Amino acid sequence: MILKASSFKLPKPPLAYSLAACFLGLLAVASLPAQDTPDKNALPRDSQEKIDIDDVTRTYVVHLPPNYDQQQHYPVVILLHGRNQDAGDMARLTHFNQLADKDGIIAVYPNASHGQWNIGVRPEEPSPFAPRRGGGGRRGGWPGGGGGYPGGGGGGGYPGGGQSGGQNPEETKNRPEPPDDVAFLNQMLDQLALKYSLDTRRIYATGLSDGGFMALRVGCSMADRVAAIAAVGAAMPKTMICLPARAVPALFINGTDDPVVPDSGGNYKPGRFHVLSAEDSAKTWSKFDRCGEKPAQGKLPAVDKGGKETKTYTYSGCQDNAQVVLYSVKNAGNTWPGGEQYTSEKEVGKTSNALNANDAIWNFLVTRKIPGESGVQK
């Protein structure tokens, strides 16, 4: 006979048997290894934060290392994305979170306003940020298509917001003020310090292309808060006014075949200002830091098999034990060495795997500290 499921029932055991089984079950549970109880106060490892500045909401993304402990104190690396990119793009193309997880770093990815940083440089030509007759707004830029390179999407942007010679006063009269990104980053650090456990003597900034220019501005304007900087695919604008409050260690990583920020100097791709060569950029920063006159030259072996060596230029003997270093990456473009090829080689050049930018940057930054007694955020 086949029993239907609805009619098939186990007989009820005696009460004494039920109590014994329950007791044995409790013993078995008690003998199991203790399980970690989720901490209701634990912070999410990835979160988007907001901050209001001059009635404008700005955002940034925070990535915490595994097993983040509020009782410990962590170094912070600010990663500044390229033009027409955002925080998520920067995290994806650099893979920096992997290094942050391994070495216990809080990685912070700020979002620029409209995808472009105010790098504090007066444009040498009419700024596309100004309203123009016949319209015309921000064009192109990866990942949305069009221009494609983070250094400039073929139009749009405010390299510094100042009115330059040759502009029509009628066109600039009603120009909206560019955002104060130094104020944004300062308030971002204030907010971070309230929520997370930071070592405030070990805060660093790095960035790619337009973000690299912004990293240079951070070194110029936030030397009291940022211990050292690293600029990738960026160079010193000829018109940048830079007066660091102290000697700020700086690393430059430039590709020899960069079509956006020319390695030999010249016109920055969007056509708004000119840059020094990579070597002259490092030399200029070495003067800020009062380093020795001539750099020591060397070579780094390629990380990938068959890759080209990376030339190095190191300025030492600087004030406060600072250092200025240039890595000249053979055949690389306006890209993050060891990262993703985020758009076509025609637009930005090649991504080299001969150097791992994450390792090179962190090896340079890791020992740098703002001079002082203590940088631990209580």
Residue ranges and their predicted role:
Residues 79-82, 109, 328:
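Structural cue for short, hydrophobic secondary-structure segments
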Residues 104-114:
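Conserved alpha/beta-hydrolase
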Residues 183-200:
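Conserved acidic catalytic loop of the alpha/beta-hydrolase fold
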Residues 256-324, 338-355:
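Active-site-adjacent alpha-helix of alpha/beta-hydrolase-fold enzymes
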